[in-house]
Amino acid sequence: MAQTIYVLNGPNLNLLGTREPEIYGRATLADVEKLCAETAAGFGLIAVCRQSNHEGQLIDWIHQARSEKVAGLVINAGGYTHTSIALHDALVGVQIPTVEVHVSNVFAREDFRHHSFIAKAAFASLCGFGIDGYRLAITGLAAKLGASATA
């Protein structure tokens, strides 16, 4: 039976493709979700992609991941990255291998974006690769889970 991973996207990521395309590019959230599904399938994994503008909903999905025995998480917490101790605590609490991803290079932007509460709860962080960061995140997560590329 294929292992499931969750790909969680936080606030404003529903606006990908139209919000500040000079920073985030023109790819849409639908493009991200398609890329994630295809990449995961290449490792025999199932990617369940979700997006919410609400912190509590993201936390509920993280908790649900534990109860459903989800193998791993990829999370782009958007602006909550820099503010949410609650998301950090949820990730630490469920003890599921997690990769943090950001479309833009947060370290080349405003100072307030340079701190991540998510990073300390993740085994890896990626930023600045555009939506390809999701492919890289799933590839790294698959390696962590011992999943091999399928033919």
From Swiss-Prot:
<feature type="site" description="Transition state stabilizer">
    <location>
        <position position="19"/>
    </location>
</feature>
<keyword id="KW-0057">Aromatic amino acid biosynthesis</keyword>
<feature type="binding site">
    <location>
        <begin position="103"/>
        <end position="104"/>
    </location>
    <ligand>
        <name>substrate</name>
    </ligand>
</feature>
<dbReference type="GO" id="GO:0009073">
    <property type="term" value="P:aromatic amino acid family biosynthetic process"/>
</dbReference>
<comment type="pathway">
    <text>Metabolic intermediate biosynthesis; chorismate biosynthesis; chorismate from D-erythrose 4-phosphate and phosphoenolpyruvate: step 3/7.</text>
</comment>
<feature type="binding site">
    <location>
        <position position="89"/>
    </location>
    <ligand>
        <name>substrate</name>
    </ligand>
</feature>
<dbReference type="GO" id="GO:0009423">
    <property type="term" value="P:chorismate biosynthetic process"/>
</dbReference>
<dbReference type="InterPro" id="IPR036441">
    <property type="entry name" value="DHquinase_II_sf"/>
</dbReference>
<comment type="function">
    <text>Catalyzes a trans-dehydration via an enolate intermediate.</text>
</comment>
<feature type="active site" description="Proton acceptor">
    <location>
        <position position="24"/>
    </location>
</feature>
<feature type="binding site">
    <location>
        <position position="76"/>
    </location>
    <ligand>
        <name>substrate</name>
    </ligand>
</feature>
<comment type="similarity">
    <text>Belongs to the type-II 3-dehydroquinase family.</text>
</comment>
<dbReference type="GO" id="GO:0003855">
    <property type="term" value="F:3-dehydroquinate dehydratase activity"/>
</dbReference>
<dbReference type="GO" id="GO:0008652">
    <property type="term" value="P:amino acid biosynthetic process"/>
</dbReference>
<dbReference type="InterPro" id="IPR018509">
    <property type="entry name" value="DHquinase_II_CS"/>
</dbReference>
<protein>
    <recommendedName>
        <fullName>3-dehydroquinate dehydratase</fullName>
        <ecNumber>4.2.1.10</ecNumber>
    </recommendedName>
</protein>
<feature type="active site" description="Proton donor">
    <location>
        <position position="102"/>
    </location>
</feature>
<keyword id="KW-0028">Amino-acid biosynthesis</keyword>
<dbReference type="InterPro" id="IPR001874">
    <property type="entry name" value="DHquinase_II"/>
</dbReference>
<feature type="binding site">
    <location>
        <position position="113"/>
    </location>
    <ligand>
        <name>substrate</name>
    </ligand>
</feature>
<dbReference type="GO" id="GO:0019631">
    <property type="term" value="P:quinate catabolic process"/>
</dbReference>
<comment type="subunit">
    <text>Homododecamer.</text>
</comment>
<feature type="binding site">
    <location>
        <position position="82"/>
    </location>
    <ligand>
        <name>substrate</name>
    </ligand>
</feature>
<keyword id="KW-0456">Lyase</keyword>
<dbReference type="Pfam" id="PF01220">
    <property type="entry name" value="DHquinase_II"/>
</dbReference>
